[in-house]
Every structure is written in C-alpha cells, then in structure tokens.
C-alpha cells in the first residue's frame, strides 16, 4: 500500500487544449515517425518555456536558475534535450487521463499528497496550473497540501533552495 505521494513540478491543462495538441502531434508522428524529434514538437512541448527567462543562456533555462547545475545538465550526453513526437504524445495522453473526472475515485482519501512547485516553473504556469490541480484534488476530498517554493523554477532539487525543498519533503 502506498503511504503517501509527492507530486513535483506539475501543472494542469484543460482537456480541450490537450486534445488539440494531441491531434497536431499525431499528424507530426504520421509525417516523421514516433521516435523523431522536430522543431515543431520542441516548440509545442517545452519550446515556449524559456520566454520568461530572457536573455536565455541555453534552451533549457526554464529548468533551473542554478547555472552550474544547468551547464552540467546541458553537457550530459545521457540527458535528452529534445522530446520525441511519440513521447510527447504519450505525455499528453497521460495528462489527459489525470484530468478525467474518475481519476481519483480509487485513491485512498486519507493518503497524504504533497504538490510542490517553484513559483517560476512554467510547467505549473508560474503557480496557476498547480493551483488549479490543487483545487481539483481538494474537491475530490483528497488529503492534499501544496507548497510553492519562491525564486525556483522546474527542477527544485537543483535550485539554490534545494535544501529547503528537501527538508520540506
């Protein structure tokens, strides 16, 4: 039995938006294949996340403000910098399933759940998306808490506030 859950660096997108993006990605998969990476998929997936962090040093500045950690990530050949069309489609499909009305039916309502996000995380829409998810989970009567880490982006465990985050968890 699961004793608790920590959901970090997430957000919420309405199903109709996910459906539109999924259709676009399906068309891209038909053209280039499931495993292909393209500028189109990059822009649809994470390409817009850097907008609020200009001037950009890298295409992944949205991950964290800690430049040393970001450089380490960018120089790591095992880290894939671009998402394939197929993986992005699967991610969107999973996000869509998380938004279904029956998603939380079988959850243990007593199990503690912590939503945690950086206030500058574009995945959580700079707290708007994670706040929406929190309200949705609260309506389902889940034992939910939310923590927003200030001056932090997506990768909370590599930010200057990492120790604070770890202690909170």
Positions of predicted regions on the chain:
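Active-site nucleophile elbow and catalytic-triad environment of alpha/beta-hydrolase enzymes
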Residues: 83-105
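Short beta-strand/loop motif that positions the catalytic acidic residue
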Residues: 115-117
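Post-His helix in hydrolase/transferase enzymes
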Residues: 128-129, 152, 157-169
């Amino acid at each position: 039995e699961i004793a608790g859950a920590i959901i970090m660096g997430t957000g919420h997108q309405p199903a109709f938006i996910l459906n539109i993006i999924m259709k676009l990605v399906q068309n891209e998969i038909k053209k280039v294949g499931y495993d292909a990476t393209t500028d189109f998929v990059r822009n649809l997936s994470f390409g817009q996340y850097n907008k609020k962090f200009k001037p950009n040093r890298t295409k992944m500045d949205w991950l964290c403000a800690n430049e040393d950690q970001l450089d380490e990530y960018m120089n790591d050949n095992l880290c894939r910098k671009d998402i394939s069309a197929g993986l992005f489609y699967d991610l969107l499909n999973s996000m869509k399933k998380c938004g279904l009305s029956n998603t939380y039916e079988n959850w243990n309502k007593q199990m503690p759940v912590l939503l945690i996000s950086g206030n500058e995380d574009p995945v959580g829409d700079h707290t708007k998306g994670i706040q929406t998810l929190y309200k949705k989970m609260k309506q389902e009567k889940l034992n939910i808490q939310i923590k927003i880490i200030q001056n932090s982006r997506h990768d909370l465990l590599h930010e200057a506030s990492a120790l604070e985050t770890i202690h909170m968890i």
